[in-house]
From Swiss-Prot:
Residues recorded with modification N5-methylglutamine: 234
Similarity comment text for this entry: Belongs to the prokaryotic/mitochondrial release factor family.
Name this polypeptide is given: Peptide chain release factor 1
Parts forming coiled coils: none
GO MF, any single term: translation release factor activity, codon specific
PTM remark: Methylated by PrmC. Methylation increases the termination efficiency of RF1.
SUPFAM superfamilies associated with the record: Release factor
Keyword Cytoplasm among UniProt keywords: yes
Length: 360
């Protein structure tokens, strides 16, 4: 029963409240901060549970009053109150079930977004730029900050590849569903016959990880330095400031030339490498899960075609949940929250189904 689990969580919350008020624990700041975070994670569940208990109590009181009431107007008022409380009871049950779902430990983290042009040549590179702009505009709407880690541009303004960081609370929880193949259908500017071309762009969203989560030994990396280049390979720096890091055990390679400082480029490249190694380990773990238990929504398979952007129809279709929106211009301007909310809801529904019995 979920009620038993909720009672246990409430007791745990109360125990933590006592502990964080203990002067002896407060002296150990690391332990105190850990307990405060643990309590904060439980607070929203406890508050919902307390409201749920109050609603149940109020319902019972109003029903008892109704059975003893003879005045017609009072009966109408009580019936309205009972109806309102019953609706809130159902809402809270759904909210609590979602709150009790296992939390992705990466949800609160910053992210690295990697966008690469796929099939389609110049058109794919141009659409890679469109997606980069879409995500940065969305980040602005969320009051998040962005920072380019590495960039490989084309002569016509497209991106062969761009890796950038988005810093903000809950960034991974909202953007993790964007990993996969994005397909675009449109008429290129150079197409005189008006024929629609199909191109693809690959997006990968990686949570930022720290040194403790992924340790990289010095002996496992080879660091090469070279001069940064701009459009068409032209040199834009007279010093060897660009950095290429090769992780020897895995073969992963990360380059960064965005900064003028070699040290800063190395720091950025190491951050990206650490996140790629983390994702690789997570993917290997996920591959070990039986196929029938894998998520339908998906948050990590780069080869999965997840979405189509059709310019002639002004349409965006997400193939995982079958949702189609007809607002392509505003979507590409960063108004993607409706799609993200739908993906989160679908993911939550699937997880609740896997949990089985969710009766209160």
């Amino acid at each position: 029963m979920l009620l038993d689990k909720l009672a246990f969580i409430e007791n745990k919350y109360d125990e933590l409240s006592v502990k964080i008020s203990d002067p002896s624990i407060m002296q150990n700041q690391n332990e105190w901060r850990k307990l405060c975070k643990e309590q904060a994670d439980l607070e929203i569940i406890v508050n919902a549970y307390k409201e749920y208990k109050q609603v149940i109590e109020d319902l019972q009181v109003n029903k008892e009053m109704l059975s003893d009431e003879s005045d017609r107007e009072m009966k109408e008022m009580l019936n309205e109150e009972i109806s309102s409380l019953a609706e809130r009871e159902i809402e809270l049950e759904k909210e609590i079930q979602i709150l009790l779902l296992p939390k992705d430990p990466n949800d609160d983290k910053n992210v690295f977004v990697e966008i690469r042009g796929g099939a389609g040549g110049d058109e794919a590179a141009l659409f890679a730029y469109n997606l980069f702009r879409m995500y940065t505009r969305y980040a602005e709407r969320q009051r998040w900050s962005t920072e380019i880690m590495s960039l490989n541009e084309t002569d016509i303004g497209g991106f062969k590849e761009v890796v950038f960081m988005i810093k903000g609370n809950g960034a991974y929880s909202k953007l993790k569903y964007e990993s996969g193949v994005h397909r675009v259908q449109r008429v290129p500017d150079t197409e005189s016959s008006g024929r629609i071309h199909t191109s693809t762009v690959t997006v990968a969203v990686l949570p930022e990880v720290d040194d403790v989560e992924i340790e990289i030994a010095d002996k496992d990396v080879r660091i090469d330095v070279f001069r940064a280049s701009g459009h068409g390979g032209q040199c834009v720096n007279t010093t060897d400031s660009a950095v290429r890091i090769t992780h020897l055990p895995s073969g992963l390679v990360v380059s960064c030339q965005d900064e003028k400082s070699q040290l800063k480029n190395k720091e950025k490249a190491m951050k990206v490498l650490r996140s790629r190694l983390f994702e690789k380990a997570e993917q290997e773990r996920a591959d070990g899960i039986a196929a029938d238990r894998k998520s339908q929504v998906g948050t990590g398979d780069r080869s999965e075609r997840i979405r189509t952007y059709n310019y002639p129809q002004g349409r965006i279709t997400d193939h995982r949940i079958g949702l189609t929106l007809y607002k392509l211009d505003s979507f590409l301007d960063g108004e993607v929250q409706e799609m993200i909310n739908a993906l989160i809801t679908a993911d939550q529904a699937e997880k609740m189904q896997k949990m089985g019995n969710t009766e209160m």
